């Protein structure tokens, strides 16, 4: 019974009711589901895709990268390289592989194999999935990967370690990507302020 055009006010009302339930996990996801449904409703009512409703340009395509390079028993460097080549053959213009589960030396061999398979012009992203437990371990590994020009290193530490991510960002030339589990503007404000 509320006006869906007031999605920002409705979000604030829902969020203010979460103080006793926690502002993480399923509570925030539920608010997000309602919020997305409201934006979808008003943009469809206007006869526009959401990006146009919000004033963005008309777009025909969205760039996508292939996320692969998972660790699998028996997977060789040659298998990894072949997998990367298949993604390029499928039309992807960038790829992402997992790192952090092996020693820095062994993971560097994986990064090298992926880079050599796709060449220097294809962006190669690395996803550590919070693999390193301290900044020094992350810096050691990332320092070894940098020879292969990664486009970014994703989630090198636990997501809550904002200062650790900031220290890594200041210490390496590879951009640090983080925030996939963060859910509110306040979370992202902390990340931005920490650089």
Feature locations, PLM:
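Catalytic domains of carbohydrate-active enzymes, especially glycoside hydrolases
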Residues: 83-98
């Amino acid at each position: 019974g509320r006006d869906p055009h007031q999605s920002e006010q409705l979000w604030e009302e829902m969020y203010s009711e979460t103080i006793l339930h926690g502002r993480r996990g399923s509570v925030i996801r539920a608010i997000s589901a309602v919020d997305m449904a409201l934006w979808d409703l008003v943009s469809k009512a206007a006869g526009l895709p959401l990006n146009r409703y919000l004033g963005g340009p008309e777009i025909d395509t969205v760039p996508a990268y292939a996320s692969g390079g998972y660790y699998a028993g028996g997977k060789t460097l040659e298998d990894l390289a072949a997998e990367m080549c298949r993604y390029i053959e499928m039309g992807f213009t960038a790829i992402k592989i997992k790192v952090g589960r092996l020693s820095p030396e062994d993971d560097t061999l994986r990064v090298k194999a992926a880079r050599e398979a796709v060449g220097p012009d294809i962006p190669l992203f690395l996803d550590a999935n919070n693999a390193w437990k301290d900044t020094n371990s992350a810096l050691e590994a990332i320092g070894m990967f940098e020879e292969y020009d990664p486009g970014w290193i994703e989630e090198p530490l636990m997501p809550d370690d904002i200062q650790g991510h900031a220290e890594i960002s200041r210490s390496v030339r590879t951009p640090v990507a983080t925030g996939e589990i963060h859910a509110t503007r306040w979370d992202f404000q902390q990340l931005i302020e920490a650089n």
